């Protein structure tokens, strides 16, 4: 139980340090999604939904851009989503590694 709390404590500590970067990435994804929505004439919710489905690389395919500029922006949104996911995974690994070393589990 102490191990789990140590991992969570370290995870949220690192998240708090990287919050400006994570917030910037999320706002950039949302903003680019709204831009694509404007180009494609989608409503705001549909554009937001599509941008995060694309950024998280889920890609249901129920909504897709048809214009060339929208497709280009969707590539950028996808890359930003991969960066965001990579940062979260790196933070999780760092927190777990710290907890393993601190508790002496091997």
Regions found by a protein language model. Name each.
Residues 1-16:
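Membrane-helix boundary elements
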Residues 15-32, 81, 85-96:
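Hydrophobic alpha-helical transmembrane segments of integral membrane proteins
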